[in-house]
Design a protein with these regions (language model features):
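Short alpha-helical transmembrane interface motifs in multi-pass membrane proteins
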Residues: 116-121, 147-151, 180
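C-terminal transmembrane helix pair
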Residues: 168, 175-223
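Short helical (or helix-break) motifs at transmembrane helix termini and adjacent helical loops
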Residues: 14-18, 157-167
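Membrane-spanning helices that line or support transport/gating and their immediate boundary helices
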Residues: 23, 134-138, 163-167
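Transmembrane helix-bundle signature of multi-pass membrane transporters/permeases
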Residues: 2-12, 35-43, 151-159, 181-189
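Juxtamembrane helix-boundary/capping and inter-helix hinge elements in multi-pass membrane proteins
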Residues: 1, 21-37, 140-148, 169-179, ...
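Alpha-helical transmembrane bundles of multi-pass secondary active transporters
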Residues: 11-133, 142, 207-223
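Membrane-embedded alpha-helical segments and adjacent helix-loop junctions characteristic
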Residues: 1, 126-148, 155
Length: 223
């Protein structure tokens, strides 16, 4: 639920807020339509892939007996799509590059970038551990269901920083960057985080994470 909530929160709520506040300050905002088209296409493919195991189980097809193998194959397909998207992104888009040149911001060195990412990753690990420990008592005291906590609370809190950055970029009239940050966040969860967690759950044992979702989550995802 938290993964699906993160995808929906970025794609609907945060993108809507960014467009609202960006338009409120700057009026009509224009952006290059090609990168969003690519992201939307990949999201449609990812959604179709995520729905397959659920349909196989709910419709009681012969594939239901091979959900484990199906999950692994679909996870690999999603990771291949992510790799292809990263390759395209690294090549860069001329319109976005032009916008970056107009802003005139200095670029970070590779060493500084790696150090900052490593520090952010370590900090995120500690914060996540604290957040999980604090969430369970809060759910019990406030009467929050697991579905609501996953779809709303964890999804919004887990992506709070990048969500604020996307809205801030739209406020500064950098629409290309804003849309890229927000939409790519959802895409990375669908194509990267979800399949990696599924594969790790099978490798490490214990609780198994599968692509089989509840009918409600499937309906929400398709909408």
């Amino acid at each position: 639920a938290a993964l699906i909530g993160s995808i929906l929160g970025n794609s609907v709520l945060v993108l809507g807020l960014a467009l609202f506040f960006g338009g409120l300050k700057n009026g009509t905002q224009r952006f290059n339509s090609e990168p969003p088209k690519m992201i939307v296409t990949l999201m449609l493919l990812a959604s179709a892939v995520l729905v397959i195991p659920t349909l196989a189980k709910e419709l009681h097809t012969p594939a239901e007996a091979h959900i484990l193998s199906l999950d692994i194959v679909l996870a690999v397909i999603l990771l291949i799509l992510l790799a292809a998207n990263i390759y395209f992104s690294v090549k860069g888009d001329p319109a976005v590059a032009m916008q970056a040149a107009e802003t005139g911001h200095a670029e970070w060195s590779m060493k500084l970038t790696i150090i900052v990412l490593a520090g952010a990753g370590i900090g995120a690990a500690f914060v996540s551990d604290w957040f999980v420990e604090a969430l369970q008592p809060a759910m019990a005291s406030l009467g929050i269901s697991e579905a609501f906590a996953g779809l709303v609370v964890v999804a919004v809190a887990g992506n709070a920083i990048e969500n604020l950055i996307g809205i801030q970029l739209a406020w500064r009239n950098q629409a290309d960057y804003a849309i890229s940050v927000i939409q790519n966040s959802s895409l990375q969860i669908a194509l990267g985080l979800f399949p990696v967690l599924v594969l790790l759950s099978y490798v490490l044992g214990g609780a198994i994470l599968t692509f089989v979702l509840s009918p409600m989550l499937v309906a929400v995802l398709l909408l």
